[in-house]
Amino acid sequence: MAPFARFSLTCLAALLLAGTAQAGTQTLPIKQTVDVLPAEQYQQHLQQLRQQVRLAVTFAQAERARPAGRASVSLQPMFSAQAGSWPFEPFVNNGLFRAIAGYQAHHPQVVTLRGGSITLAQLHDALNDSRILKRYKDGYLLSYPLMIGADAGLVLEGTSLYLSSYSGTALINQGWLGLNKSNLESMAGDKAGNTDRAWRPFVIAWAGSHTQVVGSTLKRLGYNANLSRGLTTAISTQQPASSRPATVVIRDSQFSEMSSAVELQRSQATIEGSRFEQSQQYAIDVRDSQVSVRDNQLRGIDNNSGVRLRGQTRALVENNLILGAGKAAIEVSEQQGAVLLAGNRIGDSRGNGIQLRSLAPTPAAPLVIDNNLLGSSVGSAIDASEVGALALLGNHITNTPEYAVSLRNATPMAGPLLLSGNRLGQVGKAILRVEGMRQVELGGNSFDGKPLLQNLLIGDLLPLQGTLLESTVRQGNTVRVSQR
């Protein structure tokens, strides 16, 4: 008999009879048919689906060597609405210029790098001005905004760079920024800033740039304003639409006390083996990008989700530990492109474990949630609405007060919803709620419920509960439920 450890045959029979009785007393809003699928062919289909989605989200991360030669260093005025001002134009009204005005006694200036690469020690010697860059603790304290030109690079190697909050400091990258075994953090000091909001230094990397953070630490950067939340990538309206995406490589690093640790727009990014702690908004926020997020730990997101995927995004989110998100551990909303969420361990979310909203996956760009462990969320483990297709394969869901899986579409969608090989149970309500999905395929799942006290299947599947349990549990079949 297929796995169904917590249900005796007597209890199962009671559920079957209950399902039959309920079906007999309800008027079915739609006609539903149940077909048994050939087991071997179905397993081949699942294997092909896994291979297809893995291929769709896999990419070769673009790496870039730092620019050759020694960069030139200059101080340039920050005139808004002028030629060449677009890299800092978005920050005219966000507090940066007010913070600068409280420190610089003249028209705001930015340190500009051109035509090569430079280390912090070399930059210190070239500037020779402690008001701009001075030795501090185990590295240097920067008190001016710094702009890395498209042909330039800033190298942090085994050092620390402190960014002054009081003076209005930011790193604006059009070229190449690299941290290796280094520390980048804000320094507030004991002086109040000249701003009307909680302002902190940030890093912005524009389309065409490359940023890499390896074995390094970023701390206390960003505040909740556009393009200023931490380490952010974006494309400016002043850049050609054909500009190549910003590239980001983050490995074996730590991010803590950020507004949003990493906010990616129009990017290609690899984030591996890193820790994200005490983020205010999101740990990783992705839009219109290609991203691989693997083997990371995300702990303590105050207000929103751990990982958010939106827009034209292809994403692999795999083998991550995500604990204590303010909303969902992983949120996918209004997104197009293949997504694979695999092998993640998710718990203690103050919303849903995984939240899916307004998605229309296709056979070429599927949405697959595979082999994840989800538990102890305040809402449902997986909560989906207005989702056109979804595959849930081999997941273990337990200890949630709502539903193990809830999918609701106001307007019926074609599907399919695939549920195969999942272990689902110890939930407060029904294990599976499905509304508005024209095709549902079930098989090989095990259920840990409360016999006689709760339904396993509700929504559109409630009238068929007895039939489906008989076929999939007692007989071990995989079935397709079709609505007409």
Where are the regions a protein language model picked out?
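Acidic, aromatic-lined catalytic clefts of primarily extracellular/periplasmic carbohydrate-active enzymes
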Residues: 388
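Bacterial N-terminal signal peptides
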Residues: 8-18
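Beta-strand/loop edge motif enriched in small/polar residues
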Residues: 23-384, 392, 401-407, 414-419, ...
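Bacterial N-terminal signal peptides that target proteins for export
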Residues: 1-9
